[in-house]
Curated annotation (Swiss-Prot):
Catalyzed reaction equations: apo-[ACP] + CoA = holo-[ACP] + adenosine 3',5'-bisphosphate + H(+)
Protein name per its UniProtKB record: Holo-[acyl-carrier-protein] synthase
Any Gene Ontology CC annotation: cytoplasm
Subcellular location as annotated: Cytoplasm
Residues involved in Mg(2+) binding: D8, E58
GO terms classed as biological process: fatty acid biosynthetic process
Length: 133
């Protein structure tokens, strides 16, 4: 059963402006170490890499119905790759707690994430599915 759906569109130029203005302070506040390492491996597309991940965080916050309130912070939501290479989310802190609150008893969550970009836009969709254990 689908328990959450969220999407977000992020302007890559806006992320580039934040990187230019705030540098590592912005990176460390918003992105996980795994996300920062991936961006460093893509020096010519760093803003696009970050913009897709920023959009994913926003999309997840919409899918759980909180936005960035009620203890859900951007760094609690990390984009990682499954063994297949597909993007998914690793949750900690308030994001993990909020997802657990949404799950019916006897269910576990699967998070489906898709990312795309076409300069100057990056887009993410998140679907949260509950499966009976």
């Amino acid at each position: 059963m689908i328990i959450g759906l969220g999407s977000d569109l992020c302007n890559i130029e806006r992320i580039q402006n934040s990187l230019d203005r705030f540098g590592e302070r912005f990176e460390n506040r918003v992105f996980t170490e795994i996300e920062r390492a991936k961006a460093r491996r893509r020096p010519f597309t760093i803003a696009g890499t970050y913009a897709k991940r920023f959009a994913a965080k926003e999309a997840f916050s919409k899918a759980v119905g909180t936005g960035f309130r009620r203890g859900v912070f951007m760094k609690d939501i990390g984009v990682v790759n499954a063994r297949s290479g597909a993007p998914t989310l690793a949750l900690t802190g308030g994001a993990a707690i909020r997802l657990a609150e949404l799950l019916p008893d006897g269910h576990e969550a699967s998070i489906h994430l898709t990312l795309t970009d076409d300069h100057p836009w990056a887009q993410a969709f998140v679907i949260i599915e509950a499966h009976r254990i």
